[in-house]
Amino acid sequence: MSESDTTDAGDGTALRTPIVAVLGHVDHGKTSLLDEVRGSAVTAGEAGAITQHIGATAVPLDTISELAGQLVSPEDFDLPGLLFIDTPGHHSFSTLRSRGGALADIAILVVDVNDGFQPQSYEALDILKRTQTPFIVAANKIDTVPGWNPNPDEPVQRTLEAQSDRAESRLNEQLYEIIGELSDEGFSADMYWRVQNFRENIGVVPVSAETGEGVPDLLTVLMGLSQRYLKEEMSIDVGGPGVGTVLEVKEERGFGTTLDIVLYDGTIRADDTIVVGGKNETIVTDVRALLQPQPLAEIRTEKQFEQVEAVGAAAGIKIAAPDLDDAMAGAPVRVVRDRPVEEVIAEVEAELADIQVVTEEEGIVVKADTLGSLEAIAAALEEAEIPIVRAEVGDVAPRDIAVASTAEEPKHEAVLAFNVDVLDDAEREAEEKDVKLFADDVIYQLVEEYDDYVTEIEEAQQEQILDKIERPCRFRVLKDHVFRQSNPAVVGVEVLSGTLKRNSRVVKWDGNEPERVGELKSLQDAGDDIDEARTGEQVAASIDGPTVGRQIEEGDELWAEVPEKHAKILEQELADEIPTDELEALRMYLDKQRKRDPFWGK
């Protein structure tokens, strides 16, 4: 185990390196910032001063002190340094999950000062909120402020002193916009040097990944926060059985399927038996090899990895072992060591049960790249009241399409795919079975796209229903506008409320009783045939059945008849979809019917 991974706490336990996740919107500079930290660390120390892990970079305290200059004195810290999770493929922070929340102990949310908060910034905030992970904001790209005078690798205050009033004023405007956006999301925030209590306020650190300005401050704040608020949580049992989380399941030439994991407690050895969360059942297997990247100084050697005998937390490590094909990214990994294997299986299964997504009898199919992502999507769908019938880690396969195609409601014949591929066979089957596929790498956009689709379907369904349903209309026979008395009666009418349509049955109220007087055969306006007439319009109506002067009179108020079943649907399901004048006609029609039968249309 490398010296930099832990520091002795003096009682058999040790303080491990805090795990730092870097997250933010695409192109806001997450990878550049990590590269800058890594590059500066290599320059500041000797070759090998930083340790390159699998999927992570360890920066020891001495190197941080060297980088931060007067800002950090090693004597003030017990923690051994910082371990930056470095997984560009895992741009969803929700990947990094462990017992009870996030795998990362602390996070950096990178926000471009020019763009402010963007979709993935908000998504990251939601996940930070849900997992209660402490974080700071790196306001990146300060070197792009108009008129900026770069001072490579300098702390913020020193570089600000070298700026014109105009450049500093412009930067302040951008920074306060970011602080305002955080406030809108329920976070109290300020420039980090003004924050007294980091538990209650978010510190904003202006940085440039391009020039290194502000990076000393970033490392200082991370070390300070970790030392002050996370020290107790960093206490681990050095020799105890290792506990970690799978970052990625990967094919590796010469080793077969391997696991990239982050170990956050205990130690893993090259001869350990491990238990890993699997897609179908829990996997028990023996470690064949523990692999770390070659040191930076030897990166040109032919071998990409070197084998090690043991690794202690916190570390990123690759495990080669048999039977790992079904392992899941985001799943727990535990070393068995001298405990009964059943006990460890039970622990892993209990942890997986915490992540299980609630599914319903009817709903949509969800596929995601990791367990953490699956959990985050399920939370977003639950909030949007969208039911899930099946939720799994992995690419979209034909069997997922088969499940989606059996949904009772058309809106549930859908698969939501987060950050995974759709297999060719599945795509073909989706077309054949008319299953809608949604793929995105921003959770809220995925949910929004599906929501829009459901709205489209529901609107189309309502239009179909409205087309088939008889709707109420109140109209009056105009005086002195009888063009023909019978067979059929042709009279001038005025529509009082609702829409008058051809082929409607016509009724007239006699006291409390409706009396059917005939059927509306045709409508004309200025000699032209029309299909309907709206409120306020006067048209000629041909009514088959009545004789003017007997069943109907000039000045009579007549109604388009509405069957009881249709009236019920209109009142209970479609009241929001029909125009105000039609709603008025419906209410009057229901009042008349309910005078003789209070339960009519209910």
Curated annotation (Swiss-Prot):
Database matches in CDD domains: aeIF5B_II, IF2_aeIF5B_IV, IF2_eIF5B
Keywords: GTP-binding, Initiation factor, Nucleotide-binding, Protein biosynthesis
Region feature G5, mapped onto this chain: 208-210
Segments for region (G3): 86-89
Region (G2): 49-53
Keyword Cell cycle: no
Family: Belongs to the TRAFAC class translation factor GTPase superfamily. Classic translation factor GTPase family. IF-2 subfamily.
Protein name: Probable translation initiation factor IF-2
